[in-house]
Amino acid sequence: DTYDMPTEYGSEIYAGHQPAEDSACVTALRQAGAVILGKTTTTQFASPLPVGVRNPRDIDRTPGVSSSGSAAAVADFMVPLANGTQTGGSVILPAAFCGVVGYKASLDGLDRTGIVGLKNSLDTLGYFARSVEDIALVYGAVTGNSVPADDTKPRIGLCRTPIWDEAEDC
């Protein structure tokens, strides 16, 4: 939500809806010095139905799902950063489809107060940017924490399924 712009959740029943206050994520961004330039189109209540957003990399391809307007705006250089929410893929899919960096926080990794969600046990907040460095910058600005350095060696696990022997060698 933003106190100074309509928030319609992609639905006609919320046409002209004006929140009384910012959501926690918008408050944190403003406190960090961000200027909220506008809002992008979203699908109705985060449904997977298309809403007319075009993929700036290829207008004949989908830009993704409900947060696709945010990813497309970043990919098209309209904004350097955008918020998104995810219940089942609404940050990671548009980021991949539009060729930008998408960061989906863990369940309680970022404050979701003031965000209308679908399923509290699945809804998360995320960001879109054109670089990992920009994601780290916004994460640090809104949380007050730096992104921890990963000094662990990668671990790879294989799950042997009943059809394991049918897999081809690489």
Regions found by a protein language model. Give the residues of each.
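Short, contiguous strand/loop micro-motifs
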Residues: 11-14, 56-59, 63, 162-166
